[in-house]
Amino acid sequence: MKIDYYEALGVERTADDKVLKTAFRKLAMEYHPDRNPNNPEAERKFKEIGEAYETLKDPQKRAAYDRFGHAAFENGGMGGGFGNGFGGSGGFADIFEDIFGEMMGGGRRRSNGGRERGADLRYNMEVTLEEAYAGKTAQIRVPTSITCDECSGSGAKAGSQPTTCTMCSGSGRVRAAQGFFSVERTCPTCNGRGQIIKDPCGKCHGQGRVTQERSLSVNIPAGIEDGTRIRLSGEGEAGMRGGPSGDLYIFLSVKPHEFFQRDGSDLYCKVPISMTTAALGGQFEVSTLDGTQTRVKVPDGTQNGKQFRLKGKGMPVLRQAAVGDLYIQIDIETPQNLSKRQRELLEEFEKLSSQENSPKSAGFFSRMKEFFEGIGE
């Protein structure tokens, strides 16, 4: 029985190219013969999804299939060269390589003489909040792989040259039969290099690279946040056999601050003041990250938790001219270890206090009294 190509891929008839490609890749992973050895059913399904995708990925074939179904491909219905088999030039093998090649050996590195891009590196750096505020230039030392200066990266001893691998003809890839189609694999003779080194370099032992610690200057811009990533292009490991270098990624973390807490570009802090300052009014000074001392006026009758805003005293916004604000929360301290005279004065103050001095507490206890008296009636 003929299969429905859309059902085979599990997609709607309106599916676009991206949906088709995603569906094919997912099913190809599930039913690939390498993952299902000696499983005829998986091989059958794998062939069906390959047939379906080869037809639907081609706009002309898809249009014909949508209009005529499988009849479009029978008895030469679409003219010469329009069959849906998986013949020698291209066909399903090429589809599989383009979409799914990494399953066959870790990515497509072919037709490049074995050149390989160097690995990316990660470097973790911790900065203070003050450094995050102002920015800085940091010197770091990174252990990495660099091109061997003895052999200039060839891996071969001075005076000798690598020879082209005869198994893959220098491509680093070989074709292997896989049931009804063929796929490319990494050449087992040269391990994908495309070259054979008979007389390796004594310094790098044929690798073309040596490990060395490098010193780099890193610009940390003002306003960076915890988790900010900085990319230094080409500062990763050196490539293999003439390949490009990888990149270096600096991952930044900001140390917790003793005084300030941060939320985006805004800063928050708590400032303790005495009970008398809160009641009578006064002022205090706070040090800000720009290095200045800012005087804050406290009005009389200030309550615990009162918040003051200092505009433009927060953190700079990364790569922008904007600056956040500083929010100061008042924390009123209750006096401790009172002297006899201090206690006498507070007791006298308590006797002279009225509801107007503490309207919230007086109102609260009055309402509480009324509540419990109402329960007893």
UniProtKB/Swiss-Prot annotation:
Disulfide bridge map: none
GO biological process: chaperone cofactor-dependent protein refolding; DNA replication; protein refolding; response to heat
Any Pfam family hit: DnaJ
Domain annotation J: ranges: 4-69
Keyword hit for Metal-binding: yes
GO cellular component terms, semicolon-separated: cytoplasm
Span of zinc fingers (CR-type): 135-213
PANTHER family: CHAPERONE PROTEIN DNAJ, DNAJ HOMOLOG 1, MITOCHONDRIAL-RELATED
Record comment regarding domains: The J domain is necessary and sufficient to stimulate DnaK ATPase activity. Zinc center 1 plays an important role in the autonomous, DnaK-independent chaperone activity of DnaJ. Zinc center 2 is essential for interaction with DnaK and for DnaJ activity.
Protein name (database record): Chaperone protein DnaJ
Encoding gene, per UniProt annotation: dnaJ
